[in-house]
Curated annotation (Swiss-Prot):
GO molecular function term, any single one: toxin activity
Lineage of producing organism: Eukaryota, Metazoa, Ecdysozoa, Arthropoda, Chelicerata
Function, in words: Insecticidal toxin.
Name used for this protein in its record: U2-aranetoxin-Av1a
Miscellaneous comment in the UniProt entry for this protein: Since this peptide has no sequence signal, its secretion is unsure.
Tissue: Expressed in fat body, but not in cephalothorax, silk gland, midgut.
Keywords, alphabetical: Toxin
Amino acid sequence: MALALLGLTIKPEHVPEGTGKAVADVEALACDPAQCMRSCPFNPFLNQYGGICKNGQCVCVKPS
């Protein structure tokens, strides 16, 4: 039983480091660019809604 628990603790640590793809997929799913843009205020300078996905989070771009 201890070996099974050890296997479970080692596997998650090595999977994201191996390819990096799993981490990127999770971040991409965490923030939908189209939904992010619509959820932010309209930016008249860019003539669009100002929101970008950054590190899996929606960040509203404020007009400067």
